[in-house]
């Protein structure tokens, strides 16, 4: 696990927790500081909070591609990308950048992420962020959290940030995503769930292909989140919400009943 920062961080955090239970307080800070070295992870954020470190995230404004010193135009796909930028064909531009993702070198990746950011290509941006990590680059935190151009057909009824968090986790903003269990689109909605939860007549009457429409997918996903938030076993708790969304409210209740938390809070 020496190259796996995420597991190192979670391991360090729980080591600190173990030392706290043992009363070995001199060891706690060492392991919390080690966990905090990965501030983009869940356990890294928890470690920073416990240490009392106010780690400010710089949400840098969009930057423009430097066309006078562009490495990307020197690769075969470069001219096609330049043309697509000029005519503003965002969908085709995204496909082209994703297509060259496997051959990106460091400089091409840096320029590609600028294009993705400027055109709000959230799925592409996350793929390139992963590539930059492979190159060992220190990626600015804000690049891990792109925003989507899509919104629910009937508008946002819940916080926009909440839906973005679920899109990020469920599909990485990939509108064509489909799981082995049949969950579809940005919010990875199961057709059976859509039929159960939706108030939309066209969704009830249509086959699952309607969920490939990102605005309808977000509409149904938002309705399901609203339904779950009001359940007694969720009680507007975000951790329980995420559990119920992925595993179902029935499983959430079962796990709550069966879990011995052993005073862990």
Which positions does each model-derived feature cover?
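Alpha-helical segment of the N-proximal tetratricopeptide repeat
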Residues: 76-99
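Long, contiguous interaction/recruitment modules in multidomain scaffold/adaptor proteins
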Residues: 40-44, 49-57
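Alpha-helical tetratricopeptide repeat
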Residues: 9, 13, 74-79
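TPR-adjacent "capping" and linker segments in tetratricopeptide-repeat scaffold/adaptor proteins
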Residues: 63-74
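Catalytic glycan-binding domains that act on GlcNAc-containing polysaccharides
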Residues: 6-10, 15-18, 22-34, 45-48, ...
């Amino acid at each position: 696990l020496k190259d796996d920062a995420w597991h190192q961080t979670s391991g360090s955090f729980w080591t600190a927790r173990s030392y706290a239970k043992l009363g070995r307080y001199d060891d706690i800070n060492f392991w919390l500081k080690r966990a905090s070295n990965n501030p983009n992870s869940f356990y890294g954020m928890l470690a920073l909070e416990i240490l009392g470190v106010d780690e400010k995230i710089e949400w840098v404004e969009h930057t423009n591609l430097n066309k006078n010193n562009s490495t990307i135009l020197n690769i075969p796909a470069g001219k096609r990308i330049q043309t697509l930028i000029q005519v503003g064909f965002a969908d085709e531009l995204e496909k082209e950048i994703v297509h060259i993702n496997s051959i990106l070198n460091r400089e091409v990746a840096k320029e590609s992420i600028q294009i993705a950011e400027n055109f709000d290509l959230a799925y592409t941006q996350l793929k390139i962020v992963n590539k930059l990590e492979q190159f060992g680059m220190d990626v600015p935190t804000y690049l891990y959290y792109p925003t989507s151009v899509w919104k629910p057909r009937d508008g946002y009824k819940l916080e926009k940030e909440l839906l973005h968090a679920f899109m990020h986790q469920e599909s990485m903003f990939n509108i064509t995503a489909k799981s082995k269990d049949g969950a579809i689109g940005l919010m990875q909605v199961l057709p059976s769930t859509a039929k159960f939860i939706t108030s939309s007549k066209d969704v009830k009457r249509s086959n699952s292909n309607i969920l490939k429409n990102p605005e309808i997918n977000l509409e149904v996903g938002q309705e399901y989140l609203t339904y779950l938030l009001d359940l007694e076993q969720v009680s507007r708790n975000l951790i329980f919400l995420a559990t119920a969304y992925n595993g179902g409210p029935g499983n959430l209740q079962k796990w709550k009943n069966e879990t011995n938390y052993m005073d862990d809070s």
